[in-house]
Curated annotation (Swiss-Prot):
Designated gene of the protein: murC
Annotated EC: 6.3.2.8
Role summary: Cell wall formation.
Protein name: UDP-N-acetylmuramate--L-alanine ligase
Domain of life: Bacteria
Length: 491
């Protein structure tokens, strides 16, 4: 089966290098469609697609469409984009990214992972369990899965696992058999207009599940718990540390660099219960334990054996830019993380404290003026688990500056709320020297943000080595999130 006849002609993706667009393009290419696209920059995703034989134009202009018969766009593409304007002038079908993803999903039974945070990691964990169970899933993710070296793969099995992006509301179109909701926080309000409208969208996402499917929902999160009460006539499986959770983690601890916990599994319908003891997850942090519970909830609905679940979680290779170890210098371990929302930052810093015997040093590049402005108080309160905070200039992402939403304003806000060690970063070139002056052996440095800070993080071990001291590079497989065993705090 295919979502559309192979003879529909050339499919052109505008912004093909985006993490969501690239995954769909890769799967369609592997299905046998003629795929091409354009992007503004020659990114790692673009290079990967070119390596598969997909034609990618750098720069966007009308002539790039050539013989294209269909174009696919994401919400990031503006109405005045020259390729979109050319497609409309030629009366070509214009397909939204979520619509094309939905067409792919109709071919299989699907797990769709939604939520403000944790979608990418949870998608990867579900995929890992289905892989270990021999189900050979098709996967389209919002991040690079280290085990695949890509964010997408075409499997031969009956199941598909996809990340459901809520940013533009189109996730309500996705036909999921099993839907996960990890959490719901105020985000993307520029699209929704209000938090209530965003919550209504998540309700629609869950109610799209068919009568034979299920919604797997985090009862620990107050907004998700409230949403559970609004869902009618759909099977619900809850997870969390809450005593009422159907999939409940207890006795959580850190052992040899692993998150270790017991899982009590209760069937709400029959009342039967069982327990998985000593589950080992190769990731730090309570938030990742919760993500793994969501994946366990899916696995129990699919009847996957406990030994397969255990093996998948213990051997999980992680996701790029999710607490990724990039190297060390003078016994200072350096990590790169995508966290850019206050809830994500707080969760990453909690995980960092559990992963080190020394201090935690956070380097943050705020992402978008609007986000910093709208969540300023939350940003000023989310760094409590960092012993030192280094604040860079805001990554603009095409936005214009907003008064009071700046590097210096955040530095002042953190200090005003009692943080004892906050520094402003003059520029990326100043970071190595500042880290060298601040960090001590045994400390952990984590670079946080959705912008260019990932390049600073990956260059930091080499840049520090040039200043003197011993560097240790991350192993090729070290994109695993499992950190070095902790010997001190929190045992």
């Amino acid at each position: 089966m295919r979502p559309a006849p192979l003879d529909i002609g050339n499919i052109h993706f505008v912004g093909i290098g985006g993490i969501g667009m690239s995954g769909i393009a890769e799967v369609m290419h592997n299905l046998g469609y003629t795929v091409q696209g354009s992007d503004l920059a020659d990114s790692a995703n673009v290079k990967r697609l070119k390596g598969l034989g997909i034609k990618v134009f750098i720069g966007q202009k009308a002539e790039n469409l050539a013989e294209a018969q269909v174009i696919v766009v994401s919400s990031a593409i503006r109405a005045d984009n020259p390729e979109l304007m050319e497609a409309r002038a030629r009366f070509l079908p214009v397909v939204r990214r979520a619509e094309m993803l939905a067409e792919l999903m109709r071919l299989k039974s699907c797990v769709a992972i939604g939520g403000t945070h944790g979608k990418t990691t949870t998608t990867s964990l579900v995929a890992a369990i289905l892989d270990k169970a021999g189900l050979d899933p098709t996967v389209i993710n919002g991040g690079i899965i280290n085990a695949y070296g890509t964010n997408a793969r075409l499997g031969g099995g009956e199941w598909m696992v996809v990340e459901a992006d809520e940013s533009d509301g189109t996730f309500v179109k996705l036909p999921a058999t099993i839907a996960i909701v990890t959490n719901i926080d105020p985000e993307h309000l520029d699209y929704y207009g209000s938090f209530d409208a965003a919550k209504d969208a998540f309700l629609a996402f869950v109610e799209n599940v068919p009568f034979y499917g299920a919604a797997v929902m985090c009862i620990d999160h107050p907004e998700v718990q409230a949403l559970i009460g609004r869902v009618r006539d759909r099977r619900i499986v809850t997870y969390g540390t809450n005593p009422q959770a159907d999939i409940r983690a207890t006795n959580a601890r850190v052992e040899d660099g692993f998150n270790v916990f017991d899982v009590a599994i209760t069937d709400r319908k029959t009342g039967t219960a069982r327990e998985m003891t000593g589950v080992r997850l190769a990731m730090h942090g309570t938030h990742n334990m919760l993500n793994s519970l969501a994946a366990i909830g899916v696995a129990t609905q699919m009847g996957i054996a406990d030994d397969k679940i255990r093996a998948a979680l213990e051997g999980f290779g992680g996701v790029k830019r999710r607490f990724t170890f990039v190297g060390s210098w003078n016994d200072v371990n350096i990590y790169d993380d995508y966290g850019h929302h206050p809830v994500e930052i707080a969760a990453v810093l909690q995980a960092a404290r559990s992963a080190t015997k020394g201090r935690t040093i956070a380097v943050v590049q705020p992402h978008r003026y609007t986000r910093l402005h709208n969540l300023f108080d939350e940003f000023c309160a989310c760094f409590n688990d960092a012993d030192a905070v280094i604040v860079a200039d805001v990554y603009e992402a095409g936005e214009k500056p907003i008064e009071g939403a700046s590097r210096d304003a955040l530095v002042e806000g953190l200090r005003d709320r009692g943080h004892r060690n906050v520094m402003a970063l003059d520029g990326p070139e100043a970071l190595p020297r500042l880290i060298a002056e601040t960090a001590r052996p045994g400390d952990l440095v984590v670079c946080l943000g959705a912008g260019s800070i990932t390049y600073w993080a990956n260059a930091l071990p080499d840049d520090l080595a040039k200043l003197g001291g011993k560097k240790k590079a991350a192993a090729k497989s070290a994109a695993k999130t499992k950190a070095k065993p902790k010997k001190g705090r929190g045992k």
